[in-house]
């Protein structure tokens, strides 16, 4: 993955970084019975291939500690326990989420993940009921989990204890 921000300002350096990301996922099935249990797990590794002094900050690698050079690597791992009963599935742990309210996205070298719970139900043909709550996220260019933040509107760089959502989607 290569990112080049040509800033075109005499007072700022360009940010250019090149990296390679590796993502391994394990998704088990469910145990037999009315209530089934399973486990999803992942491991991620991001390697810096290029990003010399003063060129960090493109958003694909972790931000430097002030020297203009991103770390040579970063990694993370996580898991989520899942429980299924009839047409309802509950997941708790580290989640890959994509819905209209919260979406980690895969627009950078490694995807963003969230820590919390999600609940989905597919009892009605064509309809999906979904809800959940998350308290932490792992940004796509970091190793550890952080409290949720937002930079939208007048909120600045505020943190929150959690984000809760619920919704219904239909596919015909």
Task: Outline where the language-model segments fall.
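Beta-barrel outer-membrane channel/assembly domains of diderm bacteria
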Residues: 1-97, 121-123
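Flexible, active-site-adjacent loop/turn segments at secondary-structure boundaries
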Residues: 5, 100, 112
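Extracellular loop and loop/strand-boundary signature of outer-membrane beta-barrel proteins
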Residues: 9-12, 64-67, 102-105, 147-154
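Extended aliphatic helical segments
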Residues: 34-35, 63, 101, 117, ...
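Signature for the C-terminal beta-barrel architecture of outer-membrane proteins
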Residues: 86, 108-172
